[in-house]
Amino acid sequence: MKEQKWIHEGLITESLPNGMFRIRLDNQDMILGYVSGKIRRSFIRILPGDRVKIEVSRYDSTRGRIIYRLRNKDSKD
């Protein structure tokens, strides 16, 4: 059976080397996130200040995989 994951939304607060990011979740927890392969292949840029969806394992809640970059509400796109 495939492992179940939690999906949270959060804000990128800091960009770290090797595609890692420090993310503040909506419940104020700070976790370490990395970019998923689909986002990396699609050349989607993730910068500090972006809101993202992150998938967190139930076994290690301090690390997660960024699966979606949310559109900013104040952008003109």
Swiss-Prot record:
SMART domains to which the protein is assigned, alphabetical: S1
InterPro entries tied to this protein: NA-bd_OB-fold (IPR012340), RNA-binding_domain_S1_IF1 (IPR006196), S1_domain (IPR003029), TIF_IF1 (IPR004368)
Keyword Protein biosynthesis: yes
Coiled coil feature spans: none
Localization annotation: Plastid, Chloroplast
GO molecular function: ribosome binding; rRNA binding; translation initiation factor activity
One Pfam match: eIF-1a
Record's GO cellular component terms: chloroplast; cytosol
PROSITE patterns: S1_IF1_TYPE (PS50832)
Keywords: Chloroplast, Initiation factor, Plastid, Protein biosynthesis, RNA-binding, rRNA-binding
Sequence ranges assigned to domain S1-like in this UniProt record: 1-71
Principal location: plastid
Described function: One of the essential components for the initiation of protein synthesis. Stabilizes the binding of IF-2 and IF-3 on the 30S subunit to which N-formylmethionyl-tRNA(fMet) subsequently binds. Helps modulate mRNA selection, yielding the 30S pre-initiation complex (PIC). Upon addition of the 50S ribosomal subunit IF-1, IF-2 and IF-3 are released leaving the mature 70S translation initiation complex.
Subunit-level organization: Component of the 30S ribosomal translation pre-initiation complex which assembles on the 30S ribosome in the order IF-2 and IF-3, IF-1 and N-formylmethionyl-tRNA(fMet); mRNA recruitment can occur at any time during PIC assembly.
Family: Belongs to the IF-1 family.
NCBIfam families per UniProt: infA
Designated name of the protein: Translation initiation factor IF-1, chloroplastic
